[in-house]
Amino acid sequence: KIYYIKYPIDGSGDFITIATTRPETMLGDTAIAVNPNDKRFKKFVGKIVTIPIVGRKIKIIKDDYADPEQGTGALKITPAHDFNDYEVGQRNDLEIINIFTESGKINQNAPKEYVGLDRFEARKIILKELKDKEFFVKEENIKNKVPYGDRSNSIIEPFLTEQWFADAKKLSIKAKKVVTSKKTNFFPENWSKTYFQWMNNIEPWCISRQLW
């Protein structure tokens, strides 16, 4: 399901409505993003909204990731629990608030009434509270790809943790040199283009990641 929720804009009687499949993650929202070319929201950019039932203040920002054709065109941004939101957060220097424990329960960063709840139980309670306080707009059935863990068969929750990384960019210098010097050759040769595209865009390599 996808849920439509309205966020009140401070200092006015206006609301901005977002659509989300994971309403429980609103506990960790740090911005609302709209597309820079979306005229519907132009007047709202830079305004402050209050996260419903949470009470924390966040800003409406511009970012190209927001798709005017998807949902309402306005996105809640939760950098700690969504890969794309994390990238938006990095571009816009947003705060990162992790709201989950390693066992999928709500942690101490959320309002105390939700702390300790399982994420799906929290979803039910949050939706009820949003309806009771008239922040809930509607819900719709959708087809959505949901990732499951290979070992646990549980729904995967993006989650920030401390990890060890190898400097893959530094390692790639020698890896590129052996190809440019012809010490190593590709057959067929056109695969060298793919190799260099990978090497030239390589990122730090996580060497301590966990599989669930």
Regions found by a protein language model. Name each.
Residues 1-25, 114-122, 127, 134-168, ...:
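Active-site neighborhoods of enzyme catalytic cores
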